């Protein structure tokens, strides 16, 4: 679940939900007028923008919703922003118009080639770098495996990288330890210390392993709740 836009005057927050497990499926089935008991956020530390003149932001899947406020905020701060948006297929593309209206350049990628260019976000990033594009920083937002490879490419080209992590969060205060990640050999809590970390310091293998902790439970709950409610309303 990712909040990507807020309006302080109207008192509204726009949220994009991808139906994965029990909770997100139930959220996707809410109707106009339904209520959520509590909504907590934002958590962690603000993203840094000091000293940046040109950045590439790489978003994967629903991670593009998290990338959106960062991209817009950087552009408003006078930073040149190239946005690379990646999706598995055309049916789950989100926020293209919003990105095009708010940043300098947008590159749309789909794994199967049904929309934009065919290929992965890493393919486009490497193509831009090989063509001579220079960036002060590369930011990755999305699935852990994608962020791992994006940050690896940045390191290969000698460019600083930042990964915006989205781990399991339970209490949002650092007490439960569910969002723990190893950064530079030390434990950090994404909800308090993050979500942004130096991509070259993240223990990616452990992060990916921890991200699969509830995969079996999610699959079981998804099947169960779909049987009870008659299916998932939408994919995102």
PLM features: what roles do these ranges have?
Residues 1-32:
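Ferredoxin-reductase
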Residues 6-8, 20, 50, 174, ...:
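A short, compositionally biased micro-patch
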Residues 22-170:
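FNR/FR-type flavoprotein reductase catalytic core
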Residues 36, 90-92, 130-136, 161, ...:
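Short secondary-structure transition/capping segments
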Residues 64-66, 144-145, 166-196, 224-232:
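Local cysteine-cluster metal-coordination motifs and their immediate loop/turn environment
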Residues 102, 181-182, 204, 219:
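Short alpha-helix boundary/capping motifs
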Residues 151, 174, 202-203:
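Short acidic, glycine/serine/threonine-rich loops at helix termini
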Residues 189-193, 197-236:
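Short Fe-S-cluster ligation motifs
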């Amino acid at each position: 679940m990712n909040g990507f836009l807020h309006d302080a005057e109207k008192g509204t927050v726009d949220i994009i939900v991808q139906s994965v497990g029990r909770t997100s499926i139930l959220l996707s089935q809410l109707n106009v007028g339904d209520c959520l008991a509590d909504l907590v956020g934002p958590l962690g530390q603000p993203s840094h923008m000091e000293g940046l003149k040109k950045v590439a932001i790489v978003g994967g899947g629903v991670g593009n919703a998290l990338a959106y406020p960062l991209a817009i905020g950087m552009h408003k701060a006078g930073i040149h922003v190239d946005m690379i948006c990646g999706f598995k297929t055309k049916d789950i593309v989100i926020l293209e118009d919003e990105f095009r209206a708010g940043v300098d350049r947008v590159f749309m990628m789909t794994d199967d080639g049904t929309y934009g260019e065919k290929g992965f976000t890493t393919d486009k990033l490497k193509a831009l770098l090989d063509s001579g594009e220079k960036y002060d920083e590369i930011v990755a937002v999305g699935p852990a495996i994608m962020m791992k490879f994006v940050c690896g490419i940045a390191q290969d080209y000698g460019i600083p990288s930042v990964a915006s992590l989205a781990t399991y969060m339970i209490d949002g205060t650092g007490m439960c330890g569910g969002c723990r990640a190893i950064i530079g050999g030390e434990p950090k809590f994404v909800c308090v210390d993050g979500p942004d970390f130096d991509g070259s310091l993240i223990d990616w293998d452990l992060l990916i392993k921890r991200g699969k902790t509830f995969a079996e439970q999610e699959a079981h709950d998804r099947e169960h709740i779909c049987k009870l409610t008659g299916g998932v309303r939408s994919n995102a």
